[in-house]
Amino acid sequence: MNIDALFGNKERITLGFFGGSITEGAGASENQFCYCQRVTQLLQQRYPETVFETVNASIGGTGSSLGAFRLKEDLLVHQPDFVFVEYAVNDFDTEKELCQRSMEGIVRQILNYRASCPIVFIYTLSDEMAKKYYDKGLIPQSIQYHQEVADYYHIPSINAGKPLYDTYTSQQLSVTEFLPDRVHPNDRGHEHYAQSILQVLPSMSFEIKYPKSPMQNNCLETGVMVPAKNYLASGWEYHPQSMFGRYPEYISSSQPGAKLTVPFHGSIIGIYHTIQKDSGMFSYSIDGKESTIFNSWDQYALQFDRACYFIPASDLDEDADHVLTIEVLEQKDEQSTGNMIRIGAFLMLE
């Protein structure tokens, strides 16, 4: 089945886009010029009798290991008919097992939602990927990891980054002509991505397979976000306000010694939190073992506030129950204006 069969006789199609900041539209002068909107516009031109809608559930600065936990709430609730997944740039430094567990978790959740839902993996570009791999005639490692998952499920993929690399290198242009900060495309870069996608998409065949057995036995197929308010304890305050539009609520504490106890089952636990000018540090331990300090402030907090995530552990006994303990610390980064900890949800397996 090709896109003519998928889109040609439909009254309405909802396209889902799921990825990081590139897919969210970072770098575009206006939303209409980001590659997702341009792909939608080009498909609308190709199929004028079909109404195309776009649901862009991408979040900048996040990889597939958060995506596997937020997919249901952020994208699948909108009932997409077709899903593009783009995480190769943000998964660039993610180790293979977690990367593939996450991407496979995303795939299986989509297929659990609708077994016939077409999926396409999109591979974009950063200058770091280009220098470490394409300059040497190699395929970026994260793309290799993603492609193994794609091959297992017969999911088609489009490398939109390599044609962009070929364009600026063959014309002896600087990468900044398309990626001004060497990661996020300007309008010209977004348009290049969109044209590359539409050049390949019509020739693709969608015959996705759904094996009963996952490629990774511990893939994140059952990943969910559990509200942090469920674990509210002394010294913490509940806020029904949105966490920068990324989560509908959060809890906070700046009280040194304030603790949270979070029981969970399975191999992985994550924390969906914020990074702000007044963010502090907390210690965490799992199953009463030695605690580790985590700094929820970074240098980008001086420029903007944002939602982020942290995975304290991903290789625990998958058949066992565990307990995560968090404690707010008095110490903080010297550039932070406070020691506030804000948490929207915990990432765990059902």
Give the location of each predicted region.
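Conserved catalytic region of serine esterases and O-acyltransferases that act on ester linkages
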Residues: 191-350
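Charged helix-capping and loop-helix junction motifs
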Residues: 98-105, 139-143
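Oxyanion-hole/transition-state-stabilizing segment in secreted/luminal serine hydrolases
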Residues: 16-18, 24, 64-100
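Serine-esterase "nucleophile elbow" of acetyl-processing enzymes
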Residues: 1-58, 70-79, 261, 265, ...
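Active-site-proximal beta-strand/loop segments in catalytic clefts of secreted hydrolases
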Residues: 18-20, 57-60, 86-89, 122-126, ...
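Catalytic His-Asp segment of secreted/periplasmic serine-dependent ester chemistry enzymes
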Residues: 126, 130-227
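A short helix->loop->beta-strand "cap" motif at the edges of active sites that frequently abuts
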Residues: 113-119
